[in-house]
Amino acid sequence: MTRKVALMGAGGKMGCRITDNLRKHPDRYDVAYVEVSEQGIANLAARGITPTPQSEAMAAADAVILALPDRLIGRITHDIVPQLKPGAMVVGLDPAAAYAGVMPMRADLTYFVTHPCHPPLFNEETSPEARADWFGGVAARHHIVSALHQGPEEDWDKGDMLARDIYAPVMNNYRVTVEQMAILEPALVETFAATCI
């Protein structure tokens, strides 16, 4: 059975990476690509995709991925969360909004937060494409971290599969809390990595 996924910010930097990865799994996902910016719409058009109106996408969504700039998440989620059907999953790509409490929380929704760890600086990638993929999500294998912030335990598996697909290729998905993720990214990860380099 395919899951109906609404991808908010589908034509942006992160949105395009997710768009490209979700299109590899038409058997798993029926994706509504939501985009309002002129450049984002052009990026989707280059992929042969026409954006879906936000209200239409929200009404049908089993999961909503927030591929949005952090500064917009609070405002946009206050608009879309009331439109979601009970049992839907809100997927954040960064812990900041969930940890700071800027997203409205509904008891009947699942909130899943996931973040890439990015490819290791020292790795075993051999293809030129993978070696040039410093961010991950295109060709280089990397780890991710995820948290089931709110929702039934059985939703972990749904979130895990979605996270692995949007960030593919993934080596491991390490389960953490939103608080742990907020501490690790960016403070610990970037400070530690910069010191080592």
Q: Can you describe what each PLM-predicted range is?
A:
Residues G11:
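Conserved glycine-rich cofactor-binding loop
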Residues G48-A61:
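Short acidic low-complexity segments
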